[in-house]
Amino acid sequence: DMVRPGIILYGYYCDQVNRNYIEKNNINLNLKPVMTLVSGVCSVRNFKKGNSVSYGHTWTAKKDTDIAVIPIGYGDGFLRRFSSVVKPAVNGKAYPICGRICMDQCMIEIGLNNSDVKRWDRVVLFGSKEAGALCDAQDIADATGTIPYEIMTGITKRVERVYIK
């Protein structure tokens, strides 16, 4: 006999039907996401009320604030449609993405004079809660009408992989 575990090796159910069956029958597989997408703050910039960021200036500062720039974007597989879905975590706190995710970067609003967020701080975009993520690939898939496979396999070769035993 053989088994093809597929995406369960990554800590996710293969489809909604199986997920519903497992939850309905109170089966605890204790799945945990094994992939976490992490970046860092490359700069913190002050924005005056009325200044805009991103393509099409879709976000405008409602008051004076600071923006942290994160060097990851849709060229890395962190897609534009994640802009309103993912809340990156810095030091355990969620921050909203400002505007649209760009090809090579995205921005988060951190608030004026926020000493909790500094250049080089670790930013957890999605993955395991143990790694500090506030959402996982299933959460993003549910919110964007896709499957976790697409979220995880979409991360491009530009993103360094670090394997942990």
Predicted features along the sequence, with ranges:
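Active-site anion/phosphate-binding pocket segments in diverse small-molecule metabolic enzymes
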Residues: D1-K165
